[in-house]
Amino acid sequence: MSSTGNAPISWAERAADRSPMVHRSRARSIEQARSMVDAARRLIAQKGERFTTQELVKEAGVALQSFYRHVEGKDQLLLAVMEDTIADGAAEFEAAARHLRDPLARLHFYVGAALEGVRDGDQFGPRFITSEHWRLHQLFPNEMAHATKPVTDLFLREITEARTRGLVEPADPERAAWLMTKLIMATYHHYAFATEDERAATVTEDVWTFCLAALGGTEQDRDQPAGRRRRPSASTGR
């Protein structure tokens, strides 16, 4: 993600700032960091986390020395992949729901979009994210908290607007957004490895109903169907 405006500084930009070559070639350093993350994502799609550093630098087209100028090792790169994946997802959700006029309709859409992978039976991606999330959280708790912040911030914007409009009554919008993020993460992680669950088909609506009630929403709001990860039409907003 770009660092322009109010957007957070990306991992690639932070990695470039840490590089000893930053003053001479910051743009090149950012490009290399970005290429390593993109290469890691391609390798993860092929074989999960079971790729070597040598495979990574070959896929990224960078020297091994360049790799170690940006990260201390593979775990830091996987952390960067996790951060970028979450940030990209949050940006995609926001863009896809932009035409929904009601903040609760957008929030509802985000719940459906966040749980879409496990709901659609895509096991490889969710299982990688789940297993690596908790492993990396033990190694880098502060960094992983930072990685999930784009989703919490996305929820907070909609909760705050909904509260301003009198649609919900959360006692603490920031805490509500954080707890909502954690609930969706826990649900996502559960269904990534669950074999059979008769409630899987309704999990999105179950989570949304619970969150809306916790926020102080109304029965009318509960009737809005959860969004999918596609560009919604303006007619679906309220």
Please tell me what each predicted stretch does:
Residues M1-E31, E219-R238:
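N-terminal intrinsically disordered/low-complexity leader segments
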Residues R26, A45-F51, L167-A171:
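Short, charged helix-capping/linker segments at alpha-helix termini
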Residues L115-R157, T164-V168:
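Short secondary-structure transition hinges
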Residues P126-T130, P141, A145, R163-T209, ...:
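Hydrophobic/aromatic-rich alpha-helical bundle segments in the mid-to-C-terminal region
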Residues A39-L43, G117, L183:
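Short amphipathic alpha-helical elements of helix-turn-helix/winged-helix folds
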Residues A80, E94-G121, A177-M180, G227-P232:
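Hydrophobic alpha-helical connector segments
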Residues S29, A33, L78, M82, ...:
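Amphipathic, non-transmembrane alpha-helical scaffold segments
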